Amino acid sequence: MTDCVQFRLMQADDLDRVVALEQHAFSHPWTRALYLDALTSYECWMMYLDDQHVGHGVISQIVDEAHLLNIAIAVNHQGKGLGLQLLEHLMQRASQRGCVE
């Protein structure tokens, strides 16, 4: 089976999965409350490998400048290039939104 990477915008009903991944990936993970705020203020993306949530990222935009606020890949999927794919997706989204930096 070929691995298929897909992206979609994060939704509030994703937060249980997002917070669980964060807690395994980081010693100081973002909280559910931070993600709830991020959903209304920033672009939050989910990354799937086949049908499995393997990562997520958050970007903010100020005028024409983008900032990467968070990026996470599931521990058991790290070292496979997925972080780079997620970063490239987030950079492409920022560019599509008019960001030049």
Q: Where do the PLM segments sit?
A:
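Short acidic/polar active-site loop segments enriched in Thr and Asp
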Residues: 100
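Acetyl-CoA-dependent GNAT
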Residues: 2, 9-80, 84-97
